[in-house]
């Protein structure tokens, strides 16, 4: 079907980008080592406009690469056995759902710290938007200043699919939407825009909301930001892993993701969605807000316990005898 073709094209675009970055211009130059490196590269969320992905999604994307290499072998473009060197992750039923999430209590502590000590900084804005909206990292990265209506009685931000200027939404035009934000979030964004935001344009002449001195903040900026602020020692808290921050290698930027306490942007999204459901926000409202189907939310994002789900249904059953 047309949707299947589009999905396969999207998956192979990431593989094509990896090959370009690695200087691989001919399929004959591909090796098993390259294919394993691609698996790691994609798992960690590399690729323009891409987010970190869960094992079940990674398996699907690697399976598409396998299918492509099988076709390439049929036309003698690559060795017959090359596709077998694409390493597919083993997925169990339990492994199809990530247990990595950010608890609301930790989110509150982090945001309170940023509110107190790094108010309206880029770090504060990234963490606040990821948690408050539950949106994907790529969607927040793609926001422009003009996508924000902050001085209205009902402030909001608009997510727009702009693939021609390097900020696509995962679900294309179907992912376009307005998200309501609280007055507090609107005030923080306005103070960031009026204050520490770097007043720069990106290479397409757009005014990004979240910037560095070089232009629009990169996905690696988002990831390193969240790895840093979710590490307890960053805000002076005791290390839960009995490490000395002065000597711990996890405090370095390149190895921060290895700390068991750190959380990637995708885990912030998971925690936010679970929190919204725990607060009684209907699943269809959450679905539209975070641009994911109710089935996807139920299976991959809603980390509530069975007890918490029961409590969420209780208010709807009060009229029953």
What do the PLM-derived regions correspond to, one by one?
Residues 186-225, 237-250:
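Major-groove DNA-contacting interfaces characterized by cationic-aromatic clusters
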Residues 1-97:
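N-terminal core-binding DNA-recognition domain of tyrosine recombinases/integrases
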Residues 315-321:
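C-terminal secondary-structure termini that scaffold catalytic or DNA-interacting sites
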Residues 76, 129-143, 279-281, 290-292:
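A short, glycine-centered helix-capping/turn motif at helix boundaries
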Residues 290-315:
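Catalytic-site neighborhood detector that most strongly recognizes the C-terminal catalytic loop/helix
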Residues 104-137, 141, 174, 204:
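Basic, Lys/Arg- and aromatic-enriched nucleic-acid-binding interface segment
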Residues 142-191, 197-203:
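Conserved tyrosine-mediated DNA breakage-rejoining catalytic core shared by Y-recombinases
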Residues 22, 224-288, 295:
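Short, basic (Lys/Arg/His-rich) helix/loop patches that form interaction surfaces
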């Amino acid at each position: 079907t047309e949707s299947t073709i589009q999905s396969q094209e999207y998956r192979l675009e990431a593989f094509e980008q990896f090959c370009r970055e690695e200087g691989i211009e001919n399929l004959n130059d591909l090796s098993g080592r390259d294919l394993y490196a691609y698996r790691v590269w994609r798992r960690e969320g590399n690729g323009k406009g891409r987010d970190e992905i869960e094992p079940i999604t990674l398996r699907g994307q690697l399976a598409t690469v396998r299918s492509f290499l099988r076709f390439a072998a049929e036309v003698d473009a690559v060795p017959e056995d090359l596709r077998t060197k694409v390493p597919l992750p083993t997925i169990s039923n339990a492994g199809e759902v990530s247990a990595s999430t950010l608890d609301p209590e930790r989110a509150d502590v982090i945001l309170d710290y940023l509110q107190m000590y790094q108010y309206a900084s880029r770090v504060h804005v990234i963490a606040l938007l990821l948690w408050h909206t539950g949106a994907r990292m790529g969607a927040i990265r793609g926001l422009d200043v003009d996508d924000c209506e902050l001085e209205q009685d009902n402030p909001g931000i608009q997510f727009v699919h702009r693939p021609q200027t390097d900020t696509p939404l995962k679900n294309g035009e179907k992912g376009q939407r307005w998200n309501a934000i609280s007055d507090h979030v609107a005030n923080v964004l306005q103070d960031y825009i009026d204050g520490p935001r770097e007043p720069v344009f990106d290479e397409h002449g757009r005014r990004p909301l979240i910037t560095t001195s070089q232009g629009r903040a990169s996905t690696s900026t988002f990831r390193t930001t969240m790895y840093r602020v979710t590490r307890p020692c960053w805000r002076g808290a005791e290390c839960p892993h009995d490490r000395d921050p002065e000597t711990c290698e996890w405090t370095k930027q390149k190895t921060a993701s290895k700390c068991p306490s750190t959380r990637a942007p995708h885990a912030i999204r998971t925690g936010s969605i679970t929190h919204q459901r725990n607060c009684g926000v209907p699943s269809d409202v959450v679905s539209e807000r975070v641009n994911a189907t109710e089935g996807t939310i139920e299976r991959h994002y809603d980390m509530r316990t069975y007890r918490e789900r029961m409590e969420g249904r209780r208010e709807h059953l009060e009229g029953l005898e």
